[in-house]
């Protein structure tokens, strides 16, 4: 790899080591020596020396210094690739971000009103993203905070573990739908906004706004509401455009350093695919568990080959139906592609891979309630093919009880030194209806250790206070 970052440092050298001149006044200087062995090519230039003495006739100046200019070549950070998952056989509660437990704070310390949270990680840090209504609680701008789309919504982030307050949050761009991912060198941010009939995807790479993508069905162009996925500098983003109660065909955008370099048009069962949660099954394949808001309670499942840039969609065949609302498990008859009933409506689902040397685990989340966005459970299936395996998924534990809200969920992976830690995040919405504020907490569960998932999460928020 050829480095592209070149930094030039000029050091003043003497025979004993490195000489740093610190000018304390117009006529005084102090010399600091350190023993450093430097092995770089250099060039010598004539020095400049100024003497300022009260009795210059009694001073003999001997110049034994020279200016030595050296060029340090700093390599670019490496592109990221999926690695084996860190060891573990169960998920445990890792973190709760419940901003409105601090709802008595005002001003810059006030928590932002948010929804659609997700988490994305780079090599050195994870960021907690969300879509804010440009309002805080407490405050006077609660009206409209239950709306999905308006002109005030923005994609924001904080470092994972920070509370998304006015003071802590970075505002990335105007957006009512969003995604983000890190390619190993820089962050890519995705935001969608505009009128329903002509929405626009905007891409930001680092601090620069770099590209756009226009609506292709003129019916609420939108994206994942979770992290996009990068390998070798290429980042893959799922988008869709179409009716919430009819046809909505998805596409994938291949993005490199903030610019779209290819469109991918999936084949197969393409009638309705939205809000995909995606991750790497291997260095060759991205898999996504998605939402069909129109026809079925089964999840559309995408396999995207990053070597050929082709994608295919089929319905998950398991008798454990993962959408909400949904019929009784196992009640849909016929082949795997059968839609069944209770397919209208839906919810974004959590999905993450556990990559092991000899097998792969696929972890999923779904609400405990079959009809309401309440509770959240964890399921797993090792190996097999989600397109053809009809058996029930293995139940792994309760992350959110039936008494607590369980709305959107998502997957992400934390980068350890030599392996990746799979995690699932859960949006726990404080639903105040249309008369007061409407916002969310985030619960996080990660793979760690063995045994059973031990404890569920509560938000601890009373909206009446």
UniProtKB/Swiss-Prot annotation:
Purpose of the protein: Catalyzes the removal of terminal sialic acid residues from viral and cellular glycoconjugates. Cleaves off the terminal sialic acids on the glycosylated HA during virus budding to facilitate virus release. Additionally helps virus spread through the circulation by further removing sialic acids from the cell surface. These cleavages prevent self-aggregation and ensure the efficient spread of the progeny virus from cell to cell. Otherwise, infection would be limited to one round of replication.
Modification after translation, per record: N-glycosylated.
Stretch list, region Hypervariable stalk region: 38-85
Cellular component, GO annotation: host cell plasma membrane; membrane; virion membrane
Note describing how the cofactor binds: Binds 1 Ca(2+) ion per subunit.
Residues the record marks as active site: 148, 408
Free-text activity regulation comment from the record: Inhibited by the neuraminidase inhibitors zanamivir (Relenza) and oseltamivir (Tamiflu). These drugs interfere with the release of progeny virus from infected cells and are effective against all influenza strains. Resistance to neuraminidase inhibitors is quite rare.
Recorded topology in the membrane: Single-pass type II membrane protein
Compartments it resides in: Virion membrane; Host apical cell membrane
Transmembrane segments: 12-34
Residues with attached carbohydrate: 55, 63, 143, 283
Name of the protein in its database record: Neuraminidase
Gene3D superfamilies: 2.120.10.10
Chain segments carrying region Involved in apical transport and lipid raft association: 13-35
Main subcellular location of this protein, as a coarse class: virion
SUPFAM superfamilies: Sialidases
Further information: The influenza B genome consist of 8 RNA segments. Genetic variation of hemagglutinin and/or neuraminidase genes results in the emergence of new influenza strains. The mechanism of variation can be the result of point mutations or the result of genetic reassortment between segments of two different strains.
One GO BP: carbohydrate metabolic process
Description of its domains: Intact N-terminus is essential for virion morphogenesis. Possesses two apical sorting signals, one in the ectodomain, which is likely to be a glycan, and the other in the transmembrane domain. The transmembrane domain also plays a role in lipid raft association.
Species of the source: Influenza B virus (strain B/Beijing/1/1987)
Subunit organization: Homotetramer.
